[in-house]
Amino acid sequence: MNSLLIITACFALVGTVWAKEGYLVKKSDGCKYDCFWLGKNEHCDTECKAKNQGGSYGYCYAFACWCEGLPESTPTYPLPNKSCGKK
C-alpha cells in the first residue's frame, strides 16, 4: 500500500519537475514579452496561464516574462529563424 502511494506521488512530481520553462515569446516577431515590475508580476502570470500558452506560473525576470510549467508545444525564446528586431 505504501509503495503504491509513493509511486503515485513520484508520477505526479515528474510532470512538475520536468515541465518546460523559459521566456514567453511572440510568434509574430520572435521578441520576448516585456515587463517592468520584476518578480511577482500579474501581467506575466496572466500571459503564462493563458489558454494558448498553458503555463502554471509566470513572473518578471530580467525585464521579460519567464514562465514555468509550460507544455512542450509552447514556443519559448529564442525562436528558430526569428531574431527579435533583426532582419
Swiss-Prot record:
PROSITE patterns recorded: LCN_CSAB
LCN-type CS-alpha/beta domain span: 20-85
Tissue: Expressed by the venom gland.
Keyword Hydrolase listed: no
Domain comment (free text): Has the structural arrangement of an alpha-helix connected to antiparallel beta-sheets by disulfide bonds (CS-alpha/beta).
Pfam families: Toxin_3
Function: Beta toxins bind voltage-independently at site-4 of sodium channels (Nav) and shift the voltage of activation toward more negative potentials thereby affecting sodium channel activation and promoting spontaneous and repetitive firing. Induces immediate paralysis in crickets after injection, with a total paralysis occurring within 15-30 minutes and lasting for 1-2 hours. Is also lethal to vertebrate (chicks) when injected in very high dosages (more than 100 mg/kg).
Highest rank taxon of the organism: Eukaryota
GO biological process terms, semicolon-separated: defense response
Disulfide bonds: 31-84, 35-60, 44-65, 48-67
Alphabetical keyword list: Amidation, Disulfide bond, Ion channel impairing toxin, Neurotoxin, Secreted, Signal, Toxin, Voltage-gated sodium channel impairing toxin
Effect of residue 6 to M: In CsEv1C and CsEv1E
Descriptive protein name: Toxin CsEv1
Family membership noted in the UniProt record: Belongs to the long (4 C-C) scorpion toxin superfamily. Sodium channel inhibitor family. Beta subfamily.
GO cellular-component term (any): extracellular region
First and last residue of the signal peptide: 1-19
Molecular functions per Gene Ontology: sodium channel inhibitor activity; toxin activity
Subcellular location: Secreted
Cysteine amide PTM sites in chain numbering: 84
